[in-house]
């Protein structure tokens, strides 16, 4: 067997372990960061904090690093599979030992298991990436709604549901991390057992080599050809040197694997510490959620109390509104009655003014009547005088004749003219010619019908 074969076989089985261990460590750290990110997301949901864009960019960088490392591990694993297949073909062509083929088959199966584990880790990475994208999307939605979000009745229930969901998710992540750690412990135990078995097989191969080296002189004696013996000796010496080199390589590999095991144990302890920190964080988060729920309960009770007070105030306000409406209707009625009263007062004042005007007109008419009666008395008196003068003149005319009538005419010219002016009409006719009219409707009445005029004025002023 060549000097590379055991080393390549060991590397084909354990070569991708450091990168897988690193990827698993990065994945665990990534899970812790996602848990912290979800914790901060729950704090944002409860109004306790905000996640900066810097943390989000860090998480995205972590995802990219994990993706690159996963692709690198997949490529490395494919190369190892090709190397295993090549070694398998080489061993089949050189050796017909069934034990080596069985070992190679076992190593191939273990490599397949390792590949399946790597695929499961890659799937888990994809799932975590999807969860992170969904969480980022939800965070952006929450940040967009955070500026317009107000306290309402559904806020306590939503906060409670979101906090319970976040607690459940954290518990599931914690259980998943514990299961993964347990799987890695079992895997490390199996790897250690495999290394021990491999060392035992290496020692057995050394013994076989030594036995073959011890039996070589006897075989050399039995052989007839010196050239064949020399060739076989060189062959076995070469195999012995290769076996020693492979043994040294395997010892170095075992030392390296032990160092990796110690490193993995250290990382496992760190993971356990992170799990404890997560438990403490979860307990503190639960306490904070309980406190927040109590605060929400107090707020709900306060809101209910304020609503009851608001309903009482609304009832009082409705009663006051009804009273104000009643008072307003009464005020309107009083205002209408006041307007009617003012109208009545204005009508009364108008009637009083009209009565005063009528009274004044009546007094004026009374004065006019008195003046007319006085004038009538004067006219009648003058008429009597004129009649007496006419009678005297007629008697004188009859007595003295026509010769004496010419002398008194110039002396009695003015009374004669007056008699001529008044003789065609009687005093009653002169009185009837003076007219008196109503002050309101201007209806004219003769002065002799002054009583009818008074009756008309009283009727017209009503």
From Swiss-Prot:
Single Gene Ontology MF annotation: identical protein binding
Modified residues (Phosphothreonine): 428
Entry keyword Cytoplasm: yes
Signal peptide location: none
Gene3D superfamilies membership: Geminin coiled-coil domain, Nemo cc2-lz domain - 1d5 darpin complex
Keyword Aminoacyl-tRNA synthetase: no
Location of the region described as Interaction with TSG101 in the Swiss-Prot/TrEMBL record: 157-235
This protein's name: Centrosomal protein of 55 kDa
């Amino acid at each position: 067997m060549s000097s590379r074969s055991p080393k390549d076989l060991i590397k084909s089985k354990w070569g991708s372990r450091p990168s897988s261990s690193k990827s698993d460590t990065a994945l665990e750290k990534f899970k812790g960061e996602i848990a912290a990110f979800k914790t901060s997301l729950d704090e944002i949901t409860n109004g306790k904090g905000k996640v900066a864009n810097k943390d989000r960019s860090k998480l995205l960088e972590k995802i990219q690093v994990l993706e690159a490392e996963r692709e690198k591990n997949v490529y490395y694993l494919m190369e190892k599979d090709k190397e295993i297949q090549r070694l398998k073909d080489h061993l089949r062509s050189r050796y017909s030992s069934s034990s080596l083929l069985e070992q190679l088959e076992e190593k191939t199966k273990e490599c397949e298991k390792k590949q399946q584990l790597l695929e499961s880790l890659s799937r888990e990475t994809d799932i975590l990436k999807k969860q992170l994208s969904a969480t980022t999307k939800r965070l952006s939605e929450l940040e967009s709604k955070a500026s317009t979000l107000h306290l309402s009745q559904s806020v306590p229930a939503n906060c409670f549901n979101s906090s319970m969901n976040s607690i459940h998710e954290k518990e599931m992540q914690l259980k998943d991390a514990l299961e993964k750690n347990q799987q890695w412990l079992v895997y490390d135990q199996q790897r250690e057992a495999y290394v021990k078995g491999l060392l035992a097989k290496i020692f057995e191969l050394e013994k076989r080599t030594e036995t073959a080296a011890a039996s070589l002189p006897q075989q050399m004696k039995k052989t007839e050809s010196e050239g064949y013996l020399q060739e076989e000796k060189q062959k076995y010496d070469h195999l012995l040197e290769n076996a020693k080199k492979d043994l040294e390589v395997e010892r170095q590999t075992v030392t390296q694997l032990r160092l990796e095991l110690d490193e993995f144990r250290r990382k496992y302890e760190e993971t356990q510490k992170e799990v404890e920190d997560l438990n403490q964080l979860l307990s503190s988060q639960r306490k904070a959620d309980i406190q927040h729920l109590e605060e929400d309960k107090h707020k709900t009770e306060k809101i209910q109390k304020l609503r009851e007070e608001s309903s009482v105030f609304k009832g009082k306000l409705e009663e006051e509104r009804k009273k104000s409406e009643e008072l307003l209707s009464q005020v309107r009625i009083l205002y209408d009655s006041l307007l009617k009263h003012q109208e009545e007062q204005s009508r009364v004042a108008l009637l009083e003014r009209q009565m005063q005007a009528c009274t004044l007109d009546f007094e004026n008419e009374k004065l006019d009547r008195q003046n007319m009666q006085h004038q009538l008395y004067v006219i009648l008196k003058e008429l009597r005088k004129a009649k007496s003068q006419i009678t005297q003149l007629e008697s004188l005319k009859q007595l003295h004749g026509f010769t004496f009538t010419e002398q008194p005419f110039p002396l009695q010219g003015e009374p004669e003219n007056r008699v001529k002016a008044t003789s065609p009409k009687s005093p009653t006719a002169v009185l009837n010619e003076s007219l008196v009219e109503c002050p309101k409707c201007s209806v004219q009445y003769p002065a002799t019908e002054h009583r009818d005029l008074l009756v008309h004025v009283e009727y017209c002023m009503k």
